[in-house]
């Protein structure tokens, strides 16, 4: 089995050669502990329960998911999907995520030149785009959203009603659409928010909020 083989490789200090072989069937599955994929590597599915995941620059993985831990995707890496329950997700520059980026309790940051084919979503935590492109929309319940300068979002933006028992804050999520950014599709708000839109940004129909215009870099 692949997992057994990987354990033997690790035991003999040969994991680096396994990564270098470029085997996209090489799955890594752990319960306790972090996963680090070196630069310029090709692997399959990455999964851990208690630990973070880091994927090196210019590497490729099929997917990465963790329960308690963050995920870092270094510059130039590619992957199908990223998912965590308790932890943040940071996607570096010029990365490609074919499908989705999802968190429950954690922030999500997409840096310059990154492209996500599907949606980007969380429940609690900020979502920030820095000159990035998202093809399947943005969604949160309690987090702030910043669609930074020169970012593009297709599929709209949605802030859901917060029905969680433990979340008692009356703070309104802050939504900022930055200079020369584009959000195509409906901006739908199921709870009160503060919505700020640059006078050079382009957005679709707004439901449930009153946009406040601003000029300059930030409101």
Task: Specify the residue positions occupied by each region the protein language model found.
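Intrinsically disordered, low-complexity terminal regions
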Residues: 1-219
